């Protein structure tokens, strides 16, 4: 935590390792480039996970972490969606946060700034009590942020379920969106998850700024729109890409097995297949994907989890409860042993995406994974599952960074479609076009992080504001001595 007049920022990530990773990278940048100290304040409804501890314990001493007591969610139905559980966890952690800020204030170590993510805006209540500047870190892209900023207006003007809309919604700066592609909580406006999303979005106006994990080359038109001043809209700063800089919590045997296997594959020949830390497939979709990969004849590295009927079922527990290999089609491993490698639950994605044998990534379009692919120039097959991933997929396809696997009438991507899109990416003309676009975006992602780059300048602007507020807090504290 902060000593003396060192600028001090507190960060509250929402539960889930995917929320933590980009904020860790932000903390590193604040430390290395701007001399801040950072305190992570971790809410949860259970003891911290091994993955959380591994990530936080790997950080420099100037980045501290405090785990708040677990929030009591015993009254929350087991069927509650992840957005509801996350929001309630943060909201019910406010008393513990208030106590922590009181202690820090008494010790003259109160942070100047509090950074929360999408579901953490109720922590602004505590920030206001202690005159701490509230900011939002939006971990996804400016396209989805623009949609969310427009959501309260949509809520007022649209009476039906959004999924029932017959025409795409046109929002300035956004890719046209059909209702069924809206972020997951918007698919049922009567569900508590939608009410919590709307509640948090309506509090965005209380922030003094919104930091976005994207960059100008990826979304030039959207960024112009979202940065235009408007009533009740805080300044928006593009500071990305912030991506995982290395592996944490690795299973050493699996790590070396898959990386050594990649070492023996031809350049650009392997399709990496993974649905992130929280995504799972239905049993039928799991089988169709397996058979499609085999039918494609292309090399692949597939990270598998046991199938489930809920796309986000691994969100709070990324380890498969059952043996995922037992669900593979009979004879699949023998049939594909010359060209494929299957690993269970986890793989060192940061290292995999930098490997020269990787020629593509079949992804759930989580924004962390999407950005990791972009900074490494790896072309994508978009296979969104939950959260805002359908909107991410729309953006990635629209800019030419991804091909899209098409759903059948039964809602399943069939084996023939899997084989078609895999072959198209690895060896087809459409794959070559995506590779070319990804090369351009990779170059842009490097450019914006140079000393004179767009994202570097944006974070510089924010850091100057934060340092000024720290000086103000220090002066106020000294006046009481």
From Swiss-Prot:
Role description: Possesses low quercetin 3-O-glucosyltransferase activity in vitro.
Q: Does the keyword GTP-binding apply?
A: no
* Record-listed UDP-alpha-D-glucose binding positions: 277, 347-349, 364-372, 386-389
Provide this UniProt record's keywords sorted from A to Z: Glycosyltransferase, Transferase
Disulfides per UniProt? none
What GO annotations for molecular function exist for this entry? quercetin 3-O-glucosyltransferase activity
Organism equals: Arabidopsis thaliana
A Gene Ontology cellular component where this protein is annotated is: endoplasmic reticulum
Family per record:
Belongs to the UDP-glycosyltransferase family.
**Listed name of the protein:** UDP-glycosyltransferase 72B3
Entry's EC annotation: 2.4.1.-
Q: What class of enzyme is it?
A: transferase
